[in-house]
Amino acid sequence: SDVKIEIEKRSIGSLGDMMNGKSYEDHLLRIKRVQESVEKSAEIKGAVVILKNTSEEKGDPKAALRAGFADTNRLTQFIVPDVLDEKAKDKPSKSRIHGAVLDIFRQFGYTEFADNRNTVKNPACAADVIGVYAYQTLRPLWAAESKSPVLTAKFLPAYVTFNARSGQVKAECGLFDERELSYPEALIAFSKLSRKDDFVDKCNKVARGGFVTKLLGLRDLYKKSDGLVLVSCNGLTRNLWHGISDTSISGYNMKKPFVPEKIKIGNSISERTEAFTDSHLRIIRLREGVSTLEVPDYYTEINAKGEFKQASGVYRRKDVFWGIESRPDNIEYRNSYKNCRADNPIKSFDECALMEYYPLQLREEDDPKQWVGYANLLRELMPENPSRQAVRLPAPLHLAKLMSEYFLLCDKEK
């Protein structure tokens, strides 16, 4: 269906000025001013906020403005003039404006349609896809002055469920009062929850069981209908879910490739072995080429003349699959041919990202390439970067990762 947009232009006056400092009290003052100046909306709206280029000053107001606007039921994205481009002066570039507007679309859970991308014949494309994600080192801004380590939550699990055919996006987290929220509702909830005194205690309580309860619930939920779990394998998720490590996988008894009799779920405290073969829930482990030495940076093919040629799509290498996006059609990617950021700080650069997929749990009748192909396709459905075909992570994980923008923290999650 078509998207209808109503635009209203307003001046934010001095709300966009730099704050006196960067303390929690400074943020609270600006949040209160936003609450007093901007009428609360009955429904969730988006606000694209244009700010002055104040990159060399202290007291950046963006985090406070985002929290204040969230309290008025508004999602926010900011536009500032190009920091390093002297030609821009006080005018932001068209690409920056375009990107900010499209990111507001993403914050509402908008994705591109998948049905026009040869997905009809792939049974995986009807499945709900659940991105399993964990934020780490969550220290709320209100704890900035304290030296106590107990005021930092080590991690917080969160889940985003996405169905490409319906376009529906739902978020779940143990911090929410409701079982699930729409994606924009979850962003606003995270903003408010991270400012509460019990935020760290609640994060620690939610994190205690790792992913065990959620995985068992998903196994039962998808007894007859198709579901697909995507989990990005890194140091944090391996600690929470030992069963996704290469060491654990090598010890599984396989009915056939990618169909283990049982898998390990949980961490050292809650680890247990469970069978998922009687469920229609599949699980795929992902590893990013840009973030681990275990995965190559890139893959290419050799043509009949023995020359290297560009590769894109999904390729199988032994028991893993590599997903490679098509070459981005943008100047940033072409800049990377012969230049680097160190020598050209004004220029922007881009690169293709290789993603490794390992089907941790499939059903015996499944074609692994169909399920991996669908997971890789989900990288191409996000709207906020129109100059390239794919983002780094499939849509549910991409959406889950970016929910952290609404936490009001000392430092963003790593």
Regions found by a protein language model. Name each.
Residues 1-414:
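Long, contiguous domain-sized segments
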